[in-house]
């Protein structure tokens, strides 16, 4: 959960997640939709899917016990070199280097490493430094300490050098380059993406949802059918809902900001009359907004469907 996400954001999600899934067996036994439901709002949903896949593998291949070897651990979905090293260092006291974002920042500044870690040569250098710096004793304490140092003192903006125990020998501080190191990755040009989503309503208060592809935005989550144009959305309505629906009409505008782009969503509302599209298991479903089930939904879609659950708005949308 902490990958690419701040601690303050993670804590309430972590508590709910651990209450529902106290061990690997509970996680493996749960449907992936419930896992995604509890992850909804954290983003980077591949993390949740990989966590569930890893739990299944641990149960099937390792008898429900976390592997103790680096190679077996790193072979699990979603666990790379740094995560495997951190798990073994913290949980088993085994000596393995780590290179998460916090450790990378500390090492880059302390040793004065120039260049972006996205460059393979720089990444290799940082791994070498991490290996060299990892002690043979009390490795669990060191691993936690370097992560905490990067998270609370050697922060990305306005590092607190006066409080840093490594300040005296830190090359970045001695040369006044704390704000230059580590070198940032090249920023992507921010853009706006516009889409149309069909809100197909039935009289029983349910809305048609489709599962999104696992790759891409909101991977694996359930969402309103999405289209790049109103024309394509209209063709979907005529081809899939046919005589069962009136012509779509708009219902406000939704805006959502991602890390590198902004998403504008135009909801096109149709009322399904009489017969309606049959769903394909695992691909589409009718979701009752008044009695929501525990499935993975993108945060802005959850908010929108909650608005639909309001009686007056739901009735207005169906007129």
Residue ranges and their predicted role:
Residues 2-179, 242:
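Catalytic cores of DNA base-excision repair glycosylases
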Residues 1-2, 258:
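Intrinsically disordered, low-complexity regions enriched for glutamine and histidine
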Residues 151-319:
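Intrinsically disordered, low-complexity, charged terminal extensions of DNA damage-control enzymes
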């Amino acid at each position: 959960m902490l990958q690419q996400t701040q601690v303050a954001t993670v804590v309430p999600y972590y508590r709910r997640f651990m209450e529902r899934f106290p061990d690997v067996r509970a996680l493996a036994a749960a449907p992936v939709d419930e896992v995604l439901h509890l992850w909804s709002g954290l983003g980077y949903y591949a993390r949740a899917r990989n966590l569930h896949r890893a739990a299944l593998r641990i149960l099937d291949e390792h008898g429900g016990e976390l592997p103790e070897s680096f190679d077996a651990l790193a072979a699990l979905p979603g666990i790379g070199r740094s995560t495997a090293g951190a798990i073994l260092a913290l949980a088993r006291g085994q000596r393995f280097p780590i290179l998460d974002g916090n450790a990378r920042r500390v090492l880059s500044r302390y040793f004065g490493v120039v260049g972006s870690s996205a460059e393979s040569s720089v990444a290799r250098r940082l791994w070498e430094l991490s290996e060299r710096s990892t002690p043979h004793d009390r490795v669990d304490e060191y691993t936690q300490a370097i992560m905490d140092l990067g998270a609370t003192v050697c922060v990305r903006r306005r590092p607190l050098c006066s409080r840093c125990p490594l300040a005296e020998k830190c090359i970045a501080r001695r040369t006044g380059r704390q704000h230059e190191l580590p070198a940032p990755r090249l920023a992507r040009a921010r853009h706006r993406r516009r889409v149309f989503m069909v809100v197909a309503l039935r009289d029983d208060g349910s809305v048609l949802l489709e599962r999104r592809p696992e790759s891409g935005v909101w991977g694996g989550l359930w969402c309103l059918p999405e289209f790049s144009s109103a024309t394509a959305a209209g063709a979907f309505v005529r081809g899939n809902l046919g005589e069962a629906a009136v012509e779509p009409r708009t219902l406000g505008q939704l805006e959502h900001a991602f890390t590198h782009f902004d998403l504008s969503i135009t909801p096109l509302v149709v009322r399904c009359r009489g017969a309606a599209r049959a769903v394909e298991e695992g691909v589409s479903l009718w979701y009752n907004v008044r009695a929501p089930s525990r499935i993975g939904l993108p945060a802005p879609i959850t908010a929108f469907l909650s608005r639909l659950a309001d009686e007056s708005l739901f009735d207005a949308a169906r007129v």
